[in-house]
Design a protein with these regions (language model features):
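Soluble FAD-dependent oxygen oxidases
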Residues: 2-3, 8, 15-529
Length: 529
C-alpha cells in the first residue's frame, strides 16, 4: 500500500536525521544536576548506551517509579494507546509512556532524551489524525494528563491552564466564575495542539483565535531545561512563533489565556437535503460577509456522504441567548430535515457536539484555503458530490467537505500583541477554509481514502488557480500528514520561524528528537499519491 510505504520511508528518514551532538554531554549533565538529577547515580545513564530508549525509560523509572513510567505490555499502556481519537495513532508503540506531574519533570525528559538519543512525542488531547503526531514509535510518548491545572490569577483576567487539559475540563473549571476562554469547540480536544496551531472558537469573531488570546506561554528550553516565559514583553520572538508554529520551538507546559465572560449559547445542528446546497451556500456566504456586523454568529457547514447518501449539516452558533438572530435568517428559510436549536452553556454545547466524535476509527483531515467566492464554492460542492461515490465501497466510510470562513474580524485580531506566525492579515480575506474529513474502519482502505482527498484538492486547487482564487495557507489543525504546513505561511514567516528555532534550540532538539507533527522544513510524510 502506498500509505504504508510512505510511513515506513518517513520512519527511516526520522532515524537518519542528524541528532544533537554528543559533545554536549557535559552541558546536559550539568543542566540535569541543576534539576536535582545526578547522572552518575543512575546506572542507565552512567553506563553503556546500548539501547538509547531503553536507557531513557529505565532512567525515568529509576527517578519517578512505575506510576509515572508506563511500561509496554501492561494494561495502563494499552489504555493510553487506545485513548487516541484516530486509530492510526493508537497503532504506534512507544518504548514507554512518561506521565509527568510537574514542569521540572518535562525538562528532565527533554534533557535525558538528548543524553540517550531517544526521540519523544507529547500528547495533550491526542486529536491529530495521523501516526506520530502525538505518539512516538519506539521512543517515549509523554502524556501531559497530570499537568492539568486551571487557575485564575488574582484579578481573574487570565487563567493558567496546563497542557494536560481538554477544553471541556477548562470550561467546567471556569464556568462557576462566570468566565470562559477562547478555546476549542469540542470538549475532548486538547489545549496544547489546538492553541499552538491557531485555534478556531465559537467566540473567534469577537476575540480572535485561541493563539491570539494567549497572554503568555511557559516553555521548556531544550538547551538548559529552564522554563522560559514567552509574552509580548518577554522573549517576544518566541511568543510570536508559538502562535501558530506548532511544536517547533519548544514544549509548552502552561498556557496563560485571557478570560472572557461565559455566556449562554443559542445553537443548532440544522440538517438539509443535498438538493438545497445552493441555498445553503447563499446563507453561508451571507453570514460570512456580515461577520463584522454581528460577531456573535459562528458557522460551519458539512456537505457529507455516508451509506451512499448525500446530506448537508450546518452548525449555527450564536454566543448570546437570542431566539432567531437576524444573521441566520436565510438558513431558517430553507426547509430542514432536522433542527436541534436549544440554549446551552459553553460546556454543554461542546459536550453535545462531541457525542458523535467517537474514538477508535481511522481518520483523515486535509485542507486548503481559497479566496471567498460563491460560484467557486458551488462548483466545489458539485465536484465533491460527483466523485464521492468512489468511497461507497469502503466499509464504514463517512466523508464530508467542510466549509468555514476565516473572517475579516478574525484576521484583524491576528495582528494583536505583535502578530502570529500564520502569515495572514486583514488584507488576505475573508478566506474560505475548505477541508475534507473522513472516517473508516480498515487499514486496507487507507489508499482509497487518502487518494480521494488528494485527487479532490489537486483538482480544486487547479480550478481555483484558473479563477485567480487560490490562497496557499494550510491550517495546521486540519492538515494531513502529506501537507507542508509551515511553508504555507509564506517564505518570510518560514525563515523567521527557522531563525527563532535556531536561537532557542540551536542543536535542533525539537526538530530531530521530537520528529513528529509539522516541522519547519517538510511535511510529516512525503505524499505518495
Amino acid at each position: 500500500m502506498k500509505f504504508l510505504e510512505a510511513i515506513l520511508a518517513a520512519l527511516a528518514v526520522t532515524g537518519a536525521l542528524a541528532r544533537p551532538q554528543r559533545t554536549r554531554t557535559g552541558e546536559v549533565e550539568a543542566a540535569l544536576a541543576k534539576l536535582g538529577v545526578e547522572v552518575t547515580k543512575i546506572p542507565q545513564l552512567s553506563g553503556p548506551m546500548n539501547n538509547g530508549c531503553q536507557n531513557a525509560c529505565g532512567s525515568l523509572s529509576e527517578l519517578y517509579g512505575s506510576e509515572k513510567v508506563i511500561a509496554e505490555n501492561t494494561p495502563a499502556y494499552h489504555n493510553v494507546t487506545q485513548s487516541y481519537w484516530a486509530a492510526q495513532q493508537g497503532e504506534v508503540r512507544p518504548s514507554c509512556i512518561f506521565v509527568p506531574s510537574i514542569e521540572k519533570e518535562v525538562s528532565v525528559l527533554v534533557l535525558i532524551s538528548q543524553l540517550t538519543d531517544c526521540p519523544f512525542a507529547t500528547k495533550s488531547g491526542g486529536h491529530a489524525a495521523f501516526p506520530g503526531a502525538s505518539s512516538s514509535q519506539g521512543g517515549i510518548t509523554m502524556l501531559f494528563r497530570n499537568l492539568n491545572e486551571v487557575t485564575l490569577n488574582e484579578n481573574k483576567y487570565a487563567a493558567s491552564i496546563g497542557p494536560g487539559n481538554n477544553w471541556g475540563q477548562v470550561y467546567k473549571a471556569l464556568e462557576p466564575h462566570g468566565l470562559a476562554v477562547v478555546g476549542g469547540r469540542l470538549s475532548s480536544i486538547g489545549v496544547g495542539g489546538l492553541t499552538t496551531g491557531g485555534g478556531i472558537s465559537y467566540y473567534s469573531n469577537l476575540y480572535g483565535w485561541a493563539s491570539d488570546n494567549v497572554e503568555s506561554f511557559e516553555v521548556v528550553s531544550a538547551e538548559t531545561g529552564d522554563i522560559l516565559t514567552a509574552s509580548e514583553t518577554q522573549h517576544p520572538d518566541l511568543y510570536w512563533a508559538l502562535r501558530g508554529g506548532g511544536n517547533n520551538v519548544g514544549l509548552v507546559t502552561k498556557f496563560n489565556l485571557y478570560t472572557i465572560p461565559s455566556t449562554l449559547l443559542r445553537g443548532t445542528t440544522r440538517v438539509f437535503s443535498a438538493d438545497q446546497s445552493s441555498k445553503v451556500l447563499d446563507a453561508f456566504f451571507q453570514v460570512a460577509r456580515n461577520a463584522h456586523v454581528d460577531g456573535n454568529a459562528q458557522q460551519y457547514v458539512i456537505f457529507g456522504r455516508t451509506a451512499g447518501a448525500n446530506m448537508i449539516s450546518a452548525e449555527l452558533t450564536y454566543t448570546k441567548d437570542v431566539s432567531n438572530p437576524a444573521i441566520f435568517e436565510k438558513y431558517r428559510s430553507i426547509p430542514a430535515i432536522s433542527d436541534t436549536t436549544s440554549t446551552r452553556t459553553l460546556l454543554e454545547y461542546c459536550d453535545g457536539i462531541g457525542t458523535s466524535d467517537r474514538n477508535g476509527l481511522r481518520e483523515l483531515f486535509w485542507n486548503r484555503s481559497f479566496k471567498l467566492n460563491e460560484d467557486f464554492a458551488n462548483w466545489a460542492v458539485e465536484y465533491f458530490y460527483s466523485i464521492a461515490p468512489r468511497m461507497d465501497s469502503v466499509p464504514g466510510a463517512m466523508s464530508g467537505l467542510v466549509f468555514q470562513v476565516i473572517t475579516e474580524p478574525m484576521l484583524e485580531k491576528m495582528s494583536h500583541a505583535g502578530g502570529n506566525a500564520l502569515g495572514l492579515d486583514a488584507s488576505s480575506g475573508p478566506i474560505h477554509l475548505m477541508h475534507i474529513l473522513s472516517m473508516w474502519n480498515s487499514t486496507s482502505d487507507d489508499d482509497t481514502i487518502y487518494g480521494f482527498a488528494n485527487d479532490f484538492f489537486t483538482t480544486v486547487t487547479a480550478e481555483a488557480k484558473s479563477r485567480g482564487l487560490d490562497n496557499e495557507f494550510i491550517y495546521m489543525n486540519y492538515a494531513s500528514q502529506f501537507q507542508d504546513v509551515i511553508s504555507s505561511y509564506g517564505a518570510a514567516n518560514k525563515a523567521r520561524l527557522k531563525e527563532i528555532a535556531h536561537k532557542y534550540d540551536p542543536r535542533g532538539v525539537y526538530q530531530t528528537l521530537q520528529p513528529g507533527y509539522f516541522k519547519l522544513t517538510h511535511a510529516p510524510v512525503a505524499n505518495p499519491y
